[in-house]
Amino acid sequence: MADTMQFDLVSPERSLASLQARAVQIPGAEGDMTAMPLHAPTLTTLRPGILKVDAPEGTTEYLVTGGFAQITAEGLSVLAERAIPMDEMTRAHLDELIEEARTMYKTAQEDNSEHGLVEDAAKMLADMEALGTHMSL
C-alpha cells in the first residue's frame, strides 16, 4: 500500500500546496472526511473550515471558505474559493471573512432569494463565526 498521495491546493489567488501527504482532513459540506492514499474516487463540496494536511514533513492547516475536492486513489485536488495558511491567519483576515458572510446573508434576505440561498448564507455566517472561536483569534 502506498504511504503517501499527491495533494494540491489552489485558490483563485495562488497555488498554496503541491506535496506528498499521508492524509488530509477535509471540511466537506456533508460532513468532515479524511482522504488517504488509495481512497475511493469522490467529489465533494467544501464548507468553511480547517483543512489539515498530514505530510512526512509535518502537519499544515489552512482555512478554506468553500470550494471543491476531488479525491482519487492517487491523490487529492482541492479548488478552494479562498484558502489561507493558518500561520498567516490574523484577526483582520477573520473579521473580513465574517463581514463578507454577513453581507451575503443580508443581500440574500433583501433580495427575497430562494429559501435555500438564505439558509446557505446563514450557514456560511455561522461557520465563519464558529471558526473564530475555534482559532482563538
UniProtKB/Swiss-Prot annotation:
Domain of life from the UniProt record: Bacteria
GO MF assignments: ATP binding; proton-transporting ATP synthase activity, rotational mechanism
Assigned keywords, A-Z: ATP synthesis, Cell inner membrane, Cell membrane, CF(1), Hydrogen ion transport, Ion transport, Membrane, Transport
Cellular location(s): Cell inner membrane
Record-linked InterPro entries: ATP_synth_F1_dsu/esu (IPR001469), ATP_synth_F1_dsu/esu_N (IPR020546), ATPsynth_dsu/esu_N (IPR036771)
Membrane topology of this protein: Peripheral membrane protein
Function in brief: Produces ATP from ADP in the presence of a proton gradient across the membrane.
Name used for this protein in its record: ATP synthase epsilon chain
Organism lineage: Bacteria, Pseudomonadati, Pseudomonadota, Alphaproteobacteria, Rhodobacterales
